[in-house]
Amino acid sequence: MATKKSGGSSSNGRDSRGRRLGVKKFGSELVIPGNIIIRQRGTRYHPGRNVGMGKDHTIFSKIAGVVCFRKRTGGKVFVDVVPQSCLSSV
């Protein structure tokens, strides 16, 4: 029997992958229905007009349009999707 543990294999060296969270579509980017705009843990960003929120707090687009971020009193940040037809008339 060996009196020393053989070197060469480590019992450490494992780690999990990052969760790939964050903003996926930034302000003034075009989106189509179902596009993921933000992946997050908790509600750092809140759903606004024409967007939905999944059960894991993912914010996604409900219509085709342009992403818009807006801040409200209290520091809340809302995410909206504005239809392109509204932007072309301005």
UniProtKB/Swiss-Prot annotation:
Database matches in PROSITE patterns: RIBOSOMAL_L27
Domain of life of the source: Bacteria
SUPFAM superfamilies (UniProt xref): Ribosomal L27 protein-like
GO MF: structural constituent of ribosome
Region (Disordered): 1-20
Keywords from the named record: Ribonucleoprotein, Ribosomal protein
Keyword Ribosomal protein: yes
Compositionally biased region (Low complexity): 1-13
InterPro entries in the cross-refs: Ribosomal_bL27, Ribosomal_bL27_CS
Biological process annotations from GO: translation
GO cellular component assignments: ribonucleoprotein complex; ribosome
Family stated for the protein in its record: Belongs to the bacterial ribosomal protein bL27 family.
HAMAP family membership: Ribosomal_bL27
Annotated protein name in UniProt: Large ribosomal subunit protein bL27
Organism: Anaplasma marginale (strain Florida)
Gene: rpmA
